[in-house]
UniProtKB/Swiss-Prot annotation:
Annotated InterPro entries: GPCR_Pheromne_A_rcpt, GPCR_STE3
A GO BP entry: pheromone-dependent signal transduction involved in conjugation with cellular fusion
Membrane topology: Multi-pass membrane protein
Biased composition (Basic and acidic residues): 343-357
Residue stretches spanning the membrane: 5-25, 32-52, 67-90, 110-130, 145-165, 206-226, 268-288
Molecular function GO labels: mating-type a-factor pheromone receptor activity; mating-type factor pheromone receptor activity
Annotated region (Disordered), positions in chain: 338-357
Protein name from the UniProt record: Pheromone receptor 1
Family label: Belongs to the G-protein coupled receptor 4 family.
Gene Ontology cellular component annotations, sorted alphabetically: plasma membrane
Protein role: Receptor for the A2 pheromone, a prenylated mating factor.
Keyword Nuclease applies: no
Length: 357
């Protein structure tokens, strides 16, 4: 019906984002960590939905669908919000404001990043019920899908927040690029003075990531909902009861019905491809660095040791000799006698005195 390769792309994308996740945690970049989490959850949900509802529209997992539709709705703004946090971090470093920041300022910056990456998506998802006409719908091969009523309130609570967050991210990205370009010759010194774990190469990759979000994914999102915004802005909301009539009914849409709606089919495919495509770009930028590759080697080595496919390397003879020398040296210091040393020095002085006489 739609496509048979998206679920497999999503599964591969999940593992590609998972592989360097430990390294991202060490970097302590809240925006990058949260973006990794959202991409992993989005791709895993995409794969599970496609597999469970591959050839059916039956309501097989109501509890899972309740969570899935909220996750899908949350991802509309969670990914742009994470990019906004990354762009703010880059602008703060390049503008040298982070140089003048104290420990309290760093703690405050982490809290603000968490509010952006986690708080905004939670509030955005909690308001989903206002425009939600049914608990969820089921699309063959796509799985659980949010069901919304389009009106001016949908534009205000669903479409507008994503556009505002994306525009803020674009502004910070532009400012970060401006500062980077102005201070490009001494930028390594700027990074060193900011006490940041980001090096120049990593900074450029983060800047490219925010630029791709601004130049690629934001236009795709606006392009897919522009017509809907134009048609919905003048539609009245009605009332709560009219919007939620038959809320517990679960609409089911077979593949043949979806294929009849060309616009909906196109938007559906784009919506399903955003997470896998974002994950592949993310991995290409942050999953192939030297430090990350070294982490892969260490993890692979530990896995071989755990499965007993490789033996623990034995210490060389040279290491044992060095260790023995260190032990002997340490013991010789322990047996040092201050009294003996003093007496010997005194006898030497007496002998010299007698010779002089």
């Amino acid at each position: 019906m739609l496509d048979h390769i998206t679920p497999f792309f999503a599964l591969v994308a999940f593992f590609l984002v998972l592989m360097p996740f430990a390294w991202h945690i060490k970097s302590k970049n809240v925006g990058l960590i949260m973006l990794s989490i959202w991409l992993m959850l989005g791709n895993l949900d995409n794969f599970v939905n496609s597999m469970v509802w591959w050839k059916t529209t039956a309501d097989l997992a109501p509890a899972y669908c309740e969570l899935s539709v909220r996750l899908r709705h949350l991802l509309f703004i969670a990914i742009p919000a994470s990019n906004l946090a990354i762009a703010r971090k880059l602008e703060s470093i390049a503008s040298t404001r982070q140089v003048r920041a104290g420990p309290g300022d760093h703690r405050r910056a982490v809290i603000i990043d968490l509010l952006i990456c986690l708080g905004i998506p939670i509030i955005y998802t909690s308001l989903m019920i206002v425009n939600q006409s049914n608990r969820y719908g089921i699309l063959e091969e796509a799985g659980c899908w949010p069901m919304m009523v389009f009106s001016w309130l949908w534009v205000l609570l669903v479409a507008a927040p994503v556009i505002v967050v994306s525009l803020c991210s674009a502004v910070y990205s532009a400012l970060a690029f401006r500062w980077f370009w102005v201070r490009r010759r001494q930028f390594q010194a700027v990074l060193a003075s900011s006490a940041s774990t980001i090096n120049r190469s990593h900074y450029v990759r983060l800047l490219l990531l925010t630029a791709i979000d601004m130049l690629l994914f934001f236009p795709i999102y606006v392009g897919t909902i522009a017509a809907q915004i134009k048609s919905s802005i003048s539609i009245p909301y009605g009332s709560w009861s009219s919007v939620h009539t038959g809320f517990n009914q679960i609409p089911q849409y077979p593949a043949s019905l979806v294929l009849m709606e060309n616009t909906f089919q196109r938007n559906l495919i784009l919506a399903r491809l955003v997470c896998p495509l974002s994950a592949y770009i993310f991995f290409a930028m942050f999953g192939l660095g030297l430090e990350v590759r070294q982490g892969y080697k260490e993890a692979f080595h530990r896995a071989l040791l755990f499965c007993r496919l490789r033996k623990e390397p034995k210490a060389s003879a040279l290491q044992h000799v060095v260790a023995d020398i260190e032990v002997v040296t340490f013991r010789s210091h322990d047996t040092f006698d201050a009294n003996t040393s003093t007496k010997s020095e005194k006898s030497d002085i007496d002998m010299r005195g007698s010779e002089a006489a």
